[in-house]
Regions:
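A short, N-terminal "cap"/entry segment at the start of jelly-roll beta-barrel domains
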Residues: 1-34
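Acidic, Ser/Thr/Pro
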Residues: 10, 20, 25, 38-42, ...
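Conserved short histidine dyad/triad with adjacent acidic residue
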Residues: 29-51, 81-86
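Ligand-binding loop in jelly-roll beta-barrel domains
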Residues: 85-105
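Short, conserved beta-strand element in jelly-roll/cupin
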Residues: 50-65
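A generic structural motif
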Residues: 29-31, 66-68, 93
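General beta-strand recognition
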Residues: 37, 47, 64, 91, ...
Length: 105
């Protein structure tokens, strides 16, 4: 089951806009200091880099992703997540709006 809401957060109101608007997210911090972002990727194939490790949780739509150093595309749908190591890259391929929560590890 996908996460539907968070309570007691501090939200950054200015959006993070990547790839000419193909990915838009908002960052927020939980009361315990945990940082996350919530966003949407519009249809495209994009490459993202990571500084911290990330867990991408699908809350709407679906995507295909390929981790750095692999040739295999995998699918993530609502309620599923995938892990990206710190200081890495991943490709994401979206054919319909993909809604996600990024959990920074």
């Amino acid at each position: 089951m996908a996460t539907e809401q968070f309570s007691g957060v501090t939200l950054t109101t200015k959006a993070n806009v990547y790839f000419d608007g193909k990915c838009v997210s908002h960052s927020f911090t939980l009361a315990d200091g945990t940082k996350k972002s919530v966003g949407v990727v519009r249809p495209a194939t994009l490459t993202f880099g990571t500084a911290a490790a990330e867990i991408m949780e699908c809350v709407g739509g679906s995507c295909e992703y390929k981790l750095d150093g692999t040739d295999e595309w995998k699918t993530s749908t609502v309620g599923e997540s995938f892990h990206i190591p710190a200081n890495s890259k991943f490709d994401i391929r979206v054919t319909e709006a993909y809604h996600y929560i990024c959990h920074y590890a």
